[in-house]
Amino acid sequence: MPTQREEDEAKIRQQVDKIVGGIRAKDLEGLKRLYATDVVSFDVEPPLQHVGIEAKLKNWARAFTFFQDVDYEVRDLTVTVGDDVAFGHAFGRLSGTLRDGTATNGMWVRGTFCFRKLDRNWLIVHDQASVPFDIASGKGVTDLEP
């Protein structure tokens, strides 16, 4: 019989799978159900932070405008679970077909998800996506692969 932590980890992994499905479907309403209303997101594009669910969804909606078809992949997800707080980290890649028909492989980012158990549901209260940067040039390094 699985422990409570094992059950919670399975639920969190299901939430991450739902993120992938929501992105692929460009389903803002589906994505909205996965985040706390007061989510704080540190994404790869400005500003430094997106505060609140509306800001997070606006950021996703903007990203979706670039794609005719969009794909999202998560690799090497590691999850650590507490009683009502959990975090996970992984590599993620947004790719697909741009509006002009050009296929893009996208770029791999480092991602962190912080979850809180609210009303028996694991919701994302913070997420972060980043790329390493070259200290000498100050530019992000976007061609690395896991």
Outline where the language-model segments fall.
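Outer-membrane beta-barrel domain signature
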Residues: 100-102
